[in-house]
Amino acid sequence: MERPKVYVHRVGSWAPRYLDDENRSRLADFSEIVDDSSLDAPPSNIAHRLEGVQAILSLNGAGAEDITEDALRAVGTVRIAVISHWFHGSHDRATAAWRAAGVRVTDASWGNNFAVAQWTLGAMINGVFRVAELDRAMRAGEVWPDHHFTSSMLDGQRIGLVGLGRIGRLVAGLLQPFHVEIVGYDKYVTAEEASKFNVRWCPLEQVMATSDIISLHLPVTPETTRLITRAHIESIRKGALLVNSARTAILDYEAFRECLQKGLFRAIVDVFEPEPPPVDDPLRTFPNVVMTPHIAGSTARMCHVCGRTAIEELRKQLVG
């Protein structure tokens, strides 16, 4: 039986991270691959490249917009597109065109969600045990920092999740063995639904003001931009920990920085405004801040898992 054709659009130097030898073999096991993934520029005739293709594998959003609605309509055979690693902006625009051409689009980017959730759990554990702070103290010459009674553990903490979508729910799942209380806010999630993953739904004001650890998991939309206000930030408990692997646009970033400078709470952050932050940004000097350079969802293993997850979704849709 003739195997279905799968078109892999260009993503340039990212290609081997998602489509390594193992994943390429996995895809070739059930399909004929039309592979433009390593290209840095759009192919000269995208419609020609799509001839006879039944499905698109979109490794990330770098070249997604090369595939236009007109090209898809001209070809007429593409019926499925699976996203390996969703890039907001480029994918949002591209998939609107794909859907308009009658293509069914599936987001299979769970690998990225898993990576961010694991980073978040690691940040929480780092924060309660003050790993980074103690490391800095010992490197600075403190022979044996006495922090026995300032370090803590997750057990007994109230953890507030702001955003209960994919990542928020994964974080809630990872926290289950730790004997924590989990509260959460999401405008589009009901209290009944939240309870199914052991989260007690609370208003945003309550989550921000009463949690020992706050973790942000909202996407950036017109509704969520600066949703977390100065009042919310100033209500955070003294000494609490805020973890941000989402985006800075969802909070009042100026108020966030001011409160950190005053030492009102602690933060572990993977996102900044702008990115990267200037080398002389005072945030880099705050002792109550731990920073990573936007890597929560960008690891070598994450790329492999994203590729694998999308390929297996394609297999399911194309051959059952």
Predicted features and spans:
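A short, aliphatic-rich alpha-helical micro-motif
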Residues: 47-51, 72-75, 154, 207-211, ...
